[in-house]
Amino acid sequence: MLRSIRLRNLLSFGPDSEAFPLQALNVLIGPNASGKSNLIEALGLLRATPGDLLAPIREGGGASEWLWKGGTDGRTPTASLEVVLDYPEGGMPLRYRLAFSVSGQRLELVDEAIENEHVDDASASPDFFYRHHQGHPLLNVRTRMTDRPGSAKGRQTRPLPQASAEQSILSQRRDEDSYPELSYVGAWLGRVSLHREWNLGRYTPPRLPQRTDLPGDFLLEDASNLGLVLNDLMSRRGVKQTLLENLKRLYARVEDFSVRIQGGTLQVFFHEEGLSAPIPATRLSDGTLRYLCLLTLLCHPTPPPLVCIEEPELGLHPDVLPDIGRLLREASTRTQLIVTTHSDTLISSLSEVPESVVVCEQEQGGTVLRRLEKDKLSEWLSRYSLGEVWRMGELGGNRW
C-alpha cells in the first residue's frame, strides 16, 4: 500500500506542500480546480517511471507545464514527487523520490532516490539503494543473496556513469537479485491503474467488437478490453454471480451476460428478461456501460495494488450511488483506492467511514489536502448524513 505522498512545485501543489498520509480508501472532495485531478496526474507520472517517463510529460504539454506556476522570484522551480510504500520483503517501508526541472525546454532529472523510510539503530541516515548523488548516480548492489532485501548488509556501492538524465532509474535497472528494491518499486508503480475518463459514445472501443490480443487481467484506462476482462472474471468462482447481482441494482431486467468470439474479435452480449435474443454492448445506455466498467474494477478479486477513479458518479442515476459507495468500501479491503467525486449522495454513503474522505482545497500556497476526523464529526453525523454536512459547508471543499 502507498503510505504517503508528497508533491512539491508540481502542477497545483506548491513548494511547501506537506506529506499526506494515505489509507486504503481515499475519496477526494473539493471544488473544481482545487487539485483533485492533479493528484491523480502525479500518480500517472509515477506509473510511467518504470517505462517511458517522457510519455506523460509530452501528453501534459511538456516539462514546463508540470511545474508550479505560483512562484514570484522568477526562478525555474524543481518539481518533486515522494512516496512511501510498504515493502513486505524488507524490514521497513521504502521511500521513493523523483525530482525534475526544465533545461532548454527539456526535462532534466535533478534527483532520484530509493531508500528505507527510516534510519535503523546503527545508521545516521536511511540505508539507500539508489541515489542520484548530484548527477553522479550510485547503486547499492546486493552481492550476497542470503541477505534480506531492504538491508544494507552484503551490499556494494557502485557508480552508474551511463544513467539517462531523462528517464528514471526504474526503467534502466530491473534485476530482482541485484536490485530487489528497485525492481519492487518499479513493478509496484507500473501496476497502478488509472481511470480518468471513459469515452462511451456510439462507436467507441467498449461498445464495438474488441481485439482478442489485449490483456484480460484488468480493465485498461480506455476500457477497450472490457469483454476480455469479463471473460476472465466469468471463469473465476463466484465472481460472475457477484457482477450480476450488482448489475441488477441498476439494470433490473438483465438475467445474464455472455462473451462471444467471432472472426478474431470479441463482443459482450446481455440477456434480458422477456427477450428472445441477447442485446450487444453497442445498444446499452451510457450509464449501464459505465456501471459495468465500474463493477469490473470494484468486484475484481485480484486488483492491482492501487486503483484511481475520477468521478465514478458520472452518467449514473442517483439511486445507484449508495451502491457505488458500498462497492468502494468492499473493494478497499482488496486494494487501495483514490477516488474523486462531486456527489453528496456518494459521500453520504460513506457516513460510517468519514475518515475515508479527503477535502481538497486551493490556498495561496497551492493545493492542500485534509482528511476528515470521525471524532470531530460525531455530533453532526448523529443528525445528518456526511453528504448533508458537506453541503452545509461544515467540511470545507465547497465553492463558497
Model-derived segments and their meaning:
Residues 72-74, 89, 299-302, 329-333, ...:
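Conserved catalytic network of the ASCE P-loop NTPase/AAA+ motor domain
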Residues 1, 323-400:
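C-terminal lobe/lid and adjacent interdomain/linker elements of RecA-like ASCE P-loop ATPase modules
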Residues 90-245:
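Electropositive, glycine-dotted interaction segments
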Residues 1-16:
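N-terminal pre-Walker A segment at the start of P-loop NTPase domains
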Residues 40-108:
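Conserved P-loop NTP-binding catalytic core
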Residues 31, 225, 238, 245-299, ...:
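Conserved ABC ATPase signature
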Residues 24-62, 112, 291-295, 340:
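Phosphate-binding glycine-rich loops of NTP-binding sites
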Residues 17-23, 299-302:
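Phosphate-binding P-loop
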